């Protein structure tokens, strides 16, 4: 009787753990959907530098490496750019929760803790980096219709905004990518609750496939939209696959 009670307790505890893990992974799914839509609205445009010679030629020396960005932002209306930010910033907390889910997928240890830390750090930085596209893009729009005397001040403001955007965006993406790399390594080493084949669903290889595929169609609006959301689309694929694996394997889950 005692053995039956102990087995029942272990079974209930395992079911609770699986339910909690599934909930965290679903938070990642919802966040990835929100951020994918936001990316498509914010940067999912085909580059048309020939339509904006002021930015792509005349002011290009002053804009430097940000000239292409300034041109890209002209394709979206202010309302579209705004809605390209809101779904992402208001769902960022779900990505933070999903980072705990990724941590619980890995076998406890130093690698799992480091992976969680860098993933959480990257997600925490991401709203500022993402919102920076809106503010910098709006300055780029003002540049297009400004009078000559306003150029120096507007160009200086644009460069300051772009620098802030670049620092936070690169730090966020780099940190998140490092977290996914650690998970990829652990998956291949069979030190996660996922099968080794799930390495193909990791955002790094999935994102590479999406980016390369979209680059083959530079004038396609669909490719531009998908390419602009590459990283979040890749994370959506992962969280869906991980949630499916957890649900399928259920209480019998073992690392690798």
Feature map (PLM): residue ranges:
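Hydrophobic, aromatic-enriched alpha-helical segments typical of multi-pass transmembrane helices
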Residues: 2, 8-255
């Amino acid at each position: 009787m005692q053995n039956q009670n102990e087995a029942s307790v272990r079974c209930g505890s395992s079911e609770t753990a699986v339910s909690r893990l599934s909930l965290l992974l679903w938070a990642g799914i919802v966040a990835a959907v929100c951020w994918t839509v936001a990316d498509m609205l914010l940067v999912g445009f085909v580059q048309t530098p020939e339509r904006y010679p002021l930015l792509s030629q005349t002011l290009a020396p002053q804009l430097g490496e940000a000239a292409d960005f300034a041109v890209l932002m002209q394709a979206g209306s202010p309302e579209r750019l705004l809605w390209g930010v809101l779904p992402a910033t208001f769902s960022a907390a779900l990505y933070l929760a999903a980072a705990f889910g990724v941590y619980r997928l890995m076998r406890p240890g130093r690698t799992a803790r480091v992976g969680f830390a860098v993933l959480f750090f990257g997600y925490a930085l991401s709203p500022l980096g993402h919102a920076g596209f809106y503010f910098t893009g709006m300055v780029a729009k003002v540049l297009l219709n400004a009078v000559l005397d306003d150029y120096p001040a507007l160009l200086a403001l644009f460069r300051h905004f772009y620098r802030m955007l670049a620092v936070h965006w690169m730090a966020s993406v780099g940190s998140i990518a490092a977290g996914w790399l650690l998970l990829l390594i652990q998956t291949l080493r069979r030190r996660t609750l996922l099968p080794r084949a799930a390495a193909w669903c990791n955002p790094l290889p999935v994102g590479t496939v999406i980016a390369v595929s979209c680059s083959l169609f530079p004038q396609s609006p669909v490719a531009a939209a998908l390419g602009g959301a590459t990283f979040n689309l890749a994370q959506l694929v992962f969280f869906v696959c991980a949630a499916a694996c957890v649900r399928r394997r259920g209480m019998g889950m073992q690392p690798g």
